[in-house]
Structures are given as structure tokens and as C-alpha cells.
Amino acid sequence: MPGMSSESGGGELVLFSTKEKTPVLYPLSYGLKSPVHRLSISWGCGNNLRVTVLRNPELRDDDDGEVGGKVVNVRLSGEDGEISDPQWRRIAYGSVSPFALLQSRRNSISSLSKMDMSSSLYQTAWWEYVMEYSRDIKSLLSNTISLPAPLIEDPRSVIKNAEEPTSLKAAWELMELFYADKTCLSWLPERLVDWLSEYDILLSSSHPTIYSKLQDFQKELVGLQAIEDDPRYWEVMASALSVGWLEIVVKLLHLHGSYQLDQLGHRETENGLVEAVAVLISKMPRMRPQLEDGKFGECSAAKPDFMKTRERWQSQITKLECSAFWVQCAHHQTREGLRNMLKIMIGNADCLRAATCNWMELFVSHLLYLRPFTKGLDGMHSLAQKCVQSKPVNTSHKLLRLLIGILGENTEVVLAECSKEFGSWMVAHAMELLTAGSEEGEVLVHEEQRKLGGINMEELHRLVYAQVLSSHALTWQIAPIYLASCEKQGLGLLELLFYRQPVQENQMLIKSLEICRLYELSNVSAKLMKISGVHHWKHGRKGSGIFWLQQARDENCLSVIAQQLFDSVGKSLSDESLKQWEGLVELLGSESQISGGLDFLHKYRDFKRSLKVVHDGKTIDAAHEAVERLVSLMKSPSTPQRFWLPLLHDSLKLLNWPERSLLNVTQTNLMLNKLQELSIARLRPGFIESELSAQAVGSVRLALATNLGRAFLEEC
């Protein structure tokens, strides 16, 4: 049964070997000539170890010009390093937009399907969106820089010089091929031929391949005079033909010595046989809708048309095999080499096995020549197992392990291989392909797992990838895209991600607040602003602290700050102390609801400014304005009691205004009542006495009494 392990596996979902593995050795290049005295090892970002290599300080010579130590990052991962860190970041940022668009479309289609949309329309629309998503990702994984084409093509160049593809793109195309792309179901074998022609170079790192044979032969090609006399010439052509690389085979055939002008006269029959085989190869039937320009073969989109074309083509091969011209061909290598190629085109299993180098190439050759109508994964998996037995290998390439998992419809193996060999990015993004074409994958990925805290596999792998992103300073800001798509634990981890960011950096904080705004996390943004405000205040940046606490609308913290500020001002309010906190008062503004007790300082600042205008000899209007501010201060509950008497003493000029009384009876009684409250408060423990002298207090009382009498007379 697909997806189940054998009895010998002990019941594991994914087979696990208990054999001891050889320890992995990581090179450490630190570049110090002197002996290492000490090592310090700590975790870096992601799977990086930060190794600090230190010299012996006692043996250090300042004149040797060598540094005292080096810090080296060692990456602990199964990746082969074919993709550099900048390329990984480009892929990470480039995949955000397609991923977010697909999630948005998923939500839209899900809403429509609950209303009017039929299931068939839903599946069709979703498949189109997944394919568009896959094409965007595949374009992102392609090499952005292509090598320029040569101005003059070398006639003996068999393999084009191109930048080596990546295993990540090869794995993505395999996932797309078998899970998402429904248009290629009828010509799946041909798609595998195309896949192998592009990525056989990757298999060369761990397997003997046809590509490596061609590459080695091309190096020797320049020095060969009579190419048809070399057995490797016929060997590489048979190998290339077995996997459908027709253009290479035809080009190599045209390098045959019988095509040279000085040879045509006495090698006419030999040349005719070579040309006949070349024509048959170029006319080979292909079960596919179309071919790219420059590719050989006759395409047939429908099975009946392909069968007719193939029968006619095979009859031509049989007719050529029985031709009498073979007897007239005097060149032994040419005769045997061409006949071997005819056997390959007929589908001789022994010839196909001899021509291929590994089981994947043998698998593709069988699909191309023996089983071109293979569709189901069951048949392909059975054929792949036979090919593996026919051409066993000690170590299997990661792409081939992934292919075996796909053909075996073993979703657990596919996920395990993607995670182990291609990293968390691959699993998080390929999950959409896996669930698009596999019912088993859909169930496995979206089934809630108790052992995972109630989340499903899809959410788990997105959380893992988001954690990788958040561990790096250059990618943390795109982690919220993936966390927001996780319904169960995403928002909680997103909140933790914001709390981990350095609050002392305003740009980082503003970026976090913007992300919170996008995802409507107002509670989180308020906490972030509060944390930042407290941090700035404690580290002496009082203005920034008050600003962020105001933005967070935290009245409690602002009240505490107000008390601290009052304590720092002291028992009296002088012009010198006013200058120290005047900037903070300016920052507070007039929003007393969110300023706590600091509202008093704002009002006092305005009162002092008005009083200064009065002392400068301005008009009566300035004096009235100063009185209004004084009354407002004395009425305000935010004005501390210990400041009442200093305020009245500062206002003696207003109380003793020579022309008329500036305070009416009610206002003067208010001031006298405040003095009475101060007299009673002196009897309580903990009262803070003013620094004013008794004479100053008497002056205030006399001024208020005089002003009260004048006010009575004026109002009568």
C-alpha cells in the first residue's frame, strides 16, 4: 500500500536506519599562522556555528602584523552549497509575492465555493492558480545570468557551455511535473526525457552519467583524426540516443569521416547508411504536443496518430536492418555502431541497458522506447524498481531519492527528502504543489496532529521556515507573511518575533509597527511602543521615551514619569529648573488625557511665559492672561500641593497690580482657601515644607488680603 513502510521497518512512517553514520567533518579555515591558543564556540544565525579562534597573547608579537584572532562561521546543514547566501536571500524575498498571492486566492476561492461555485470549477480555478504560482517560483529559481552565445559555433562542440542548474530547481520541476501540471499527463514520459536532458549534469556528482561521458569525449574530440575509428564515438552516440538526445546524436553522426569531400567517392555506401540512420533519428515519433525549435522528432498529440507514425517508423528501421547495403559497408565500426543504434530505436532491452549509465537513464530509455504510453504512478514505480535492481548504486542522489518517493506515492518520504536535502524553504513552498495533485498528500498535510499541538503539517513547516527567516537580520521582516498564514500558532509567534527586535532602533520599531498595522495587531503595536518608551526613558532619552509612551497611550507609565520629573524639579520651581524640562513639556502638548501628571508642567510652562511678558512691561491684557493661567493651575487637580505657595509668590506682581485688582472676589477666595489648606496640611505627617521664608509667606497673605478688599470695592 502506498505510504506504508514494510514490516521490517518497525512501523515507522519514514524508514530510519539505526546504523551509525560517519561523523560529518566541516573544514575550518581561519588563516592564522601562529598556533591556536583557545577556541570559543557559540550559535550564530540559523544553522551556523560561530567559532572564535584566538592566539596566545603571551606569544603575540606586535611587529608580525598578524591579528590576535579570527571569527569563522561554519554552516551545519545538508546543503551542498551550490546556492550562496545572497542568492538564498534573493529567492526568499522573490518567493514572498507569489506565496502571498496564492494564499489570497485560496481564501477567495474558498469563500466562493461555499456560496455558488461548484467543486469542478473550484478545482479548475485552483489548479490554474497553482500552476501560475509554480511558474513564478520556477522563474525565480532559474539562473538570472546566462552565458553569451559564441559568435562562431564550433562544429565539433557537442555540449553547449551553460551555467550548471541547481538541484533546487530540478526538485521543484519534479514536484510540478507529478503533482501540479495536469496538461502533461498524456506525455509524462517525454517530460521526464526533457527533465533528464537538463539535469543529468547534476547526477554526475554521485553517479556515472551519459552527460559526463559526452563531456569527457568532447575534450578528446579535437585530437581525433578518424573519429569513426574510436569506439568511444559509437558508445557515446548510443548512450545519447538511448535517452532521446537526438540533436547530439545527429550532430555526432555528421562528424563521420564519410562526410568529408575526399572520402565521398569510395565511401558512398557507408555514408548512405550513416545518413539513413541520421534521418530515422531526426524523424523519431514523439508522444507530445510540440517540440522546441531545433529539436528533432515528429510530434503526435493523440495516441492513435502516434501509434500509426511509430509503426511506419519502425517498419522503416526493420527495412533498413534487412538491407543488403550492410554487406557492402567495409568499415566494421560503422556497421556495428549503426546496427546497435537501430536496435536501440527498436527498443532492445539489452542494448538500452548497455547504453545507459545509471538506473534513472535506463528508466527514461524504457519510457521512451518500450513504454511510451505509461501514465499511472504504479506502473512507473514498478519500472523504476526494476531499473534500480538492474543498475544498483551504493549511494543515491537526492533527486533520485525524491523521485522514488514521488513514484511510490509516499508523501512522508517526499516531505522528508525535501526537508532534509532542500531545506525549509522548499517544504514551505512546495506544499502547495503536493496538495494540488495528491489526495493522500492533501489529507496528510492538512490533518491536525495532536503530537504537534493541534496544528497540521502545513502549518508546522511554515512555522519552521518563518523561524529560519526570523533568525537573520536581513530576512526577519518577511517572516510575518508566513506566520500570518498559520491559523493556530502563527499570530502568537508573530508577537514573539516583534518582541525580539531591538527596541532602541527607531527604524526597526517603525517597520514592526507598520507590519502590525497591516495585520491589525493593535494590541501588539501598543506593547511594542510601551517597551520602547520605557527603554528610552531608562537610558536617558527622556523625550523619545515620553513620545512612544504617548503613542502607546499608557497613562500609568506617564504618571510614574511625571512623579519622577516632579521629584527632580524639587520643592520650588525656578527658572533654571524650568529650562531643564522645558523641552519635555513642549513634547507633551496639551493632551492631558494621555499625559498623566505631566499636564501640570505644560500649564506651568505657559504660566511662566505669560508672567515673563508681564515683567517685561507689556499691556494689561498680558496681565489678565497670566491671571487666567494662575487660576487654572490652582484649580487643576494635577498641580501638586507643595507648588501652591511658590506659584502665589511668583504672582505677587499680579496680586499687587497698581491700577486695579486683577483677581475678582471669587478668584481671591480660591487663593485664600488654598493657603488655608496648606496650613491644615502642615499638621499631617509627611508634609513637604516650602523653601520660602516666613517673610515671603507673609507677603503673599498681605497681597491676597489687599486684593480681596480692592475687589470688594470694585464689585460694589
Curated annotation (Swiss-Prot):
One of its GO terms (biological process) is protein transport. It is found in: Nucleus envelope; Nucleus, Nuclear pore complex. Coiled coil: none annotated. Keywords: mRNA transport, Nuclear pore complex, Nucleus, Protein transport, Translocation, Transport. One of its GO terms (cellular component) is nuclear pore. Pfam families: Nucleopor_Nup85 (PF07575). Functions as a component of the nuclear pore complex (NPC). Part of the nuclear pore complex (NPC). The NPC has an eight-fold symmetrical structure comprising a central transport channel and two rings, the cytoplasmic and nuclear rings, to which eight filaments are attached. The cytoplasmic filaments have loose ends, while the nuclear filaments are joined in a distal ring, forming a nuclear basket. NPCs are highly dynamic in configuration and composition, and can be devided in 3 subcomplexes, the NUP62 subcomplex, the NUP107-160 subcomplex and the NUP93 subcomplex, containing approximately 30 different nucleoporin proteins. Belongs to the nucleoporin Nup85 family. This is Nuclear pore complex protein NUP85. The gene is NUP85.
